[in-house]
């Protein structure tokens, strides 16, 4: 095989601070995993940064890592780097992969016991400089600024070059002054003490003024007394700090800068394929790029993949800027994109639903068909964006409509190949996700009517309530203050009123005023309840009441939310622009906001709500006979659970018992701990432990199912719904207890929540054509609710049909139950 083009000689040595770069990219790209749930963000980020540097500076390349053994600095100063957070659990495994990548690229890799990477880099840089090379050091570590010279520069990972001129412009210092400056100022990240009371600004000024530490101490009598005292008191720390800051340039290393190594191209290809770095396969030159497409006239043949670009993301509001179609190596571009839509019979492409919504807006009956995003999402629900999918499976998401069309065609073929043999995932694609995208397109284009006048009146009412709450808060505080200022609120609550500080913020360490903290303090002082009410009212006013009228489309007079099909880890739909999921269902103001969603004149809203669907799904998945029997016999699940837990007859269950049982019934689905339960029910911790134990005694197969689900998840790396939808949960095997427990809660909740989502989606797909026959519309899907709109004279028929379809969507061991309501608005339909 030919040598990679990125290794062409440049007369320059590139030194890479491997450990530093790996750690930096680990945090910069948090959340990037393979389809198996394997975290790879550090590997990907490292490879991208390295590749960019190799293309520009890659004649001789040496990658340096810190050795595991402590360095001489740890021996000189035990507290060196002592303040650093523990190494993240995922990092060592990714670091091993990075080293494997370096070896496959044929690059020199060095680790020297007893010395840090800085010392190795410094030695190599000075030696290469002496041999006549130009040197670039890829790092963001400021310790190495002391090495800068005419022939040594630092290449920052963000792409800019740090030279002696840059250093002088930014700090007013020369490279040979850097160690003295660091010795004075110290470095908290490495726990280098510096001189107490002297910060970076003062240290810069002193070194600029006196040139060096040596000269400064020779003229100490000319320094103002307060500074002189600090310097004299800190002489020992200063000497230590200078020793720790100085890098070694004389390590006994053997590196031949003239020797070149050949990369292992087959191994590199296998490595990148294993980690699903499709875009890097192209960038490293290991895959032939797509052949230049032959330009062809519009329109493309039926079945072509489309690419398009909008002026803004929301299809109901966007202008169609460009439209293209790709098919079998030919690229067709529409000269007039909007007119070009009229030549199409369907939409295949990335984000196909969005283009279909825009077409429906223009009066064209175009519906989405195949979408590679849906295939990618089924392979791994972390595949939520075109950029991420292109990066993982090969390609680049650009602004060009033609490139997007070609990418869609390639990705569809790649992803279909990956799904070969995955019959359950393919079934979900063909029977659920693909037809659902057609339903959602029509729902988005239809929208829902909004009573704007009502919202404007509600805004005035809520504004008056907010002002009244403000006055009450100020009266209780004894003076006015800015209720929206976290710092002012902190002072009022904890300093002036003396309330206990329960927690601190992660970033600043200040006393927390979060909702959770205030909830815990609600009984401590009447001001807390008023503040919580104030926050709820202002949040809903600013998020919904005031913005919603502006979102009504001038052409349709309706509100058009966007339904996101590839956004959640469980398979549930989400909505945005606006997000209707976040309107509270049970609070008075949340209900008043729902009142603004109204039916068209002569129509009514039909609202259908799956009753306790997740508990019914749990009964089916666990096979627990007691749980199944309760639902089969139509008994109240919370009353029956309380009866078994407390050892009383169902008639003897009081409201407190039922509340406890209800909290546990739903809490179990989300892994509620005894500590959380004790807080929810205001009972002792020991009693909460006993409650949970009695719950599992009442439903023994639920515990067995949870344990079995976790065991299977640990073995396979993922959990799945009744229909085979997957969620990868690699942290089930984490060593850190809190990380592992969080993964466990996700793992046994997902099959329940995801199955409920699958049932809702399947019901929508089956109900949609039946509604069209009756002239009814599907408007919204929020949580477990489906909101329809029907002509008044057909509303009862529509309601009966929808209930029948939703309850009979799939045979389970327990009946699905749907509550139905009709009304002129969303609120009255639920009452």
UniProtKB/Swiss-Prot annotation:
GO terms for biological process: DNA-templated DNA replication; double-strand break repair. It holds the Pfam family 5_3_exonuc. GO terms for molecular function: 5'-3' exonuclease activity; DNA binding; DNA-directed DNA polymerase activity; nucleoside binding. It is an enzyme of class 2 (transferase). SUPFAM superfamilies: 5' to 3' exonuclease, C-terminal subdomain, DNA/RNA polymerases, PIN domain-like, Ribonuclease H-like. Gene3D superfamilies: 3.30.70.370, 5' to 3' exonuclease, C-terminal subdomain (1.10.150.20), 5'-nuclease (3.40.50.1010), Ribonuclease H-like superfamily/Ribonuclease H (3.30.420.10), Taq DNA Polymerase, Chain T, domain 4 (1.20.1060.10). NCBIfam families: pola (TIGR00593). This is DNA polymerase I, thermostable. It comes from Thermus thermophilus. The gene is polA.
């Amino acid at each position: 095989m030919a040598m990679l083009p990125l290794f062409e000689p440049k007369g320059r040595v590139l030194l890479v601070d491997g450990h530093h770069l790996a750690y930096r990219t680990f945090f910069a790209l948090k959340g990037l995993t393979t389809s198996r749930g394997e975290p790879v963000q550090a590997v990907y980020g490292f490879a991208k940064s390295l590749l960019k540097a190799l293309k520009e500076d890659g004649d001789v390349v040496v990658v340096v890592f810190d050795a595991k053994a402590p360095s001489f600095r740890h021996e000189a100063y035990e507290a060196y780097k002592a303040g650093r957070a523990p190494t993240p659990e995922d990092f060592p495994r990714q670091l091993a992969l990075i080293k494997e990548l370096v070896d496959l690229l044929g690059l020199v890799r060095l680790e020297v016991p007893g010395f840090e990477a800085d010392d190795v880099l410094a030695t190599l840089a000075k030696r290469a400089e002496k041999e006549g090379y130009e040197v670039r050091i890829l790092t963001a570590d400021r310790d190495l600024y002391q090495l800068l010279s005419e022939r040594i520069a630092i290449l920052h990972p963000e792409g800019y070059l740090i030279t002696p001129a840059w250093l002088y412009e930014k700090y007013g210092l020369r490279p040979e002054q850097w160690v003295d400056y660091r010795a004075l100022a110290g470095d908290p990240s490495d726990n280098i003490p510096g001189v107490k009371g002297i910060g970076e600004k003062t240290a810069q000024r002193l070194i600029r003024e006196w040139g060096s530490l040596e000269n400064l101490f020779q003229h100490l009598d000319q320094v103002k007394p307060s500074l002189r005292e600090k310097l004299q008191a800190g002489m020992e720390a200063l000497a230590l700090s200078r020793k720790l800051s100085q890098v070694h340039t004389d390590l006994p290393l053997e590196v031949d800068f003239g020797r070149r190594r050949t990369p292992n191209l087959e191994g590199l290809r296998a490595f990148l394929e294993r980690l699903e770095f499709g875009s890097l396969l192209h960038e490293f030159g290991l895959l032939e790029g797509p052949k230049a497409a032959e330009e062809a006239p519009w329109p493309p043949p039926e079945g072509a993949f489309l690419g398009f670009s909008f002026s803004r993301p929301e299809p109901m509001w966007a202008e169609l800027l460009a439209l293209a179609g790709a098919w079998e190596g030919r690229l067709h571009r529409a000269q007039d994109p909007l007119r070009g839509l009229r030549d199409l019979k369907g939409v295949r492409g990335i984000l196909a639903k969005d283009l279909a919504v825009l077409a429906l807006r223009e009066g064209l009956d175009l519906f989405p068909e195949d979408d590679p995003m849906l295939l990618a999402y089924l392979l791994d629900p972390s595949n939520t964006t075109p950029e991420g999918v292109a990066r993982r499976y090969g390609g680049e998401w650009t602004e060009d409509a033609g490139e997007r069309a070609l990418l869609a065609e390639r990705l569809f073929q790649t992803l279909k190949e990956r799904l070969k043999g995955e019959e359950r995932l393919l079934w979900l694609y063909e029977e659920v996700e693909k037809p659902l995208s057609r339903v959602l397109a029509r729902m988005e284009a239809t929208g829902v009517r909004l009573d704007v006048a009502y919202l404007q009146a509600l805004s005035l009412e809520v504004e008056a309530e907010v002002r009244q709450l403000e006055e009450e808060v100020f009266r209780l505080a004894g003076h006015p203050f800015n209720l929206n200022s976290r710092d002012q609120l902190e002072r009022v609550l904890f300093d002036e009123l003396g309330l206990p500080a329960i927690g601190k913020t992660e970033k600043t360490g200040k006393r927390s005023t979060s909702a959770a903290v205030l909830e815990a303090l609600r009984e401590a002082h009447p001001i807390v309840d008023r503040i919580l009410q104030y926050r709820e009212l202002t949040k809903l006013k600013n998020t919904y009441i005031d913005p919603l009228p502006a979102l009504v489309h001038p052409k349709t007079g309706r509100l058009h939310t966007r339904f996101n099909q590839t956004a959640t880890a469980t398979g549930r739909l989400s909505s945005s622009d606006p997000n209707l999921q976040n309107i509270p269902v049970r609070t008075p103001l949340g209900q008043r906001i729902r009142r603004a969603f109204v039916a068209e004149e002569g129509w009514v809203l039909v609202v259908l709500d799956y009753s306790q669907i997740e508990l019914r799904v749990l009964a089916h998945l666990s096979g627990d006979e007691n749980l199944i029997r309760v639902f089969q016999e139509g008994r109240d699940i919370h009353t029956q659970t309380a009866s078994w837990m407390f050892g009383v007859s169902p008639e003897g269950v009081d409201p407190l018992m039922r509340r406890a049982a209800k909290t546990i019934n739903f809490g179990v689905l989300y892994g509620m701990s005894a500590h959380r339960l004790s807080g929810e029910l205001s009972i002792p911790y020991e009693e909460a432990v006993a409650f949970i134990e009695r719950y599992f005694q009442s439903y023994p197969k639920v515990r067995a199912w949870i344990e079995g689900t976790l065991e299977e998840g640990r073995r396979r790396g993922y959990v799945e719904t009744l229909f085979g939808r997957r969620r990868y949960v690699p942290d089930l095997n984490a060593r850190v207890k809190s990380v592992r427990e969080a993964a466990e809660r996700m793992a046994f909740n997902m099959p329940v929540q995801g199955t409920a989502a699958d049932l809702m989606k399947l019901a929508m797909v089956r109900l949609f054509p039946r509604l069209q026959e009756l002239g009814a519309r599907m408007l919204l899907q929020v949580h477990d609710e489906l909101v329809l709109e029907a002509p008044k004279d057909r509303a009862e028929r529509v309601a009966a049909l929808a209930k029948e379809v939703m309850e009979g969507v799939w045979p389970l061991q327990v009946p699905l139950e749907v509550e139905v309501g009709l009304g002129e608005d969303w609120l009255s339909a639920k009452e």
